[in-house]
Amino acid sequence: MELLTNFPLLSSLAAIIFAQVIKVPIQFIVSRKLDWSLVTSTGGMPSSHSAAVTALSTGVALEHGLDSSLFAVSAIFAVITMFDATGVRRHAGEQATVINKLVIDFNRFVNEAKDFPKAAEKEKQKKLKELLGHQPIEVFFGGLTGILLTLVLAYFFM
């Protein structure tokens, strides 16, 4: 089956898995807290999106050359993805932080204004996910992860 021998695809998937798994020990080193939920979460160091798109572009470059149209498409796709990770998604995460604080402050105000006996209802309120985007350094190391991992895989499998 050709899908199972598609080097750019496989290197991109390997980069996603590697970047997601490596987030756990990196966060442990920084915070001394073991958080396995990072394996399936967005945001954090390194950016798995950046690792994936740079691995894809590197794999395409190795297979088809830097002068191919396919590389041009994958490179532009990578740039847009990494720009989005540091721009729109990061700002959405910052907005989620502010909105969550507003909800907490509003609930505190309501509780102080009157005796609010519905604690169970308050606990059911959904918080917005705040870790959506990436700091530029996370995107940089995600991209570097994708490139280096693909070069290592190419050495062994191409």
Swiss-Prot record:
Entry's transmembrane regions: 10-30, 137-157
Coiled-coil stretches: none
Keywords: Cell membrane, Membrane, Transmembrane, Transmembrane helix
Membrane topology value: Multi-pass membrane protein
Entry-linked InterPro entries: DUF212
Localization per Swiss-Prot or TrEMBL: Cell membrane
Stored Pfam families: DUF212 (PF02681)
Annotated Gene Ontology cellular component terms: plasma membrane
Domain of life: Bacteria
Classification via PANTHER family: ACID PHOSPHATASE/VANADIUM-DEPENDENT HALOPEROXIDASE-RELATED PROTEIN (PTHR31446), ACID PHOSPHATASE_VANADIUM-DEPENDENT HALOPEROXIDASE-RELATED PROTEIN (PTHR31446:SF29)
Protein name as it appears in the record: Uncharacterized membrane protein YuiD
Lineage summary: Bacteria, Bacillati, Bacillota, Bacilli, Bacillales
Primary gene name: yuiD
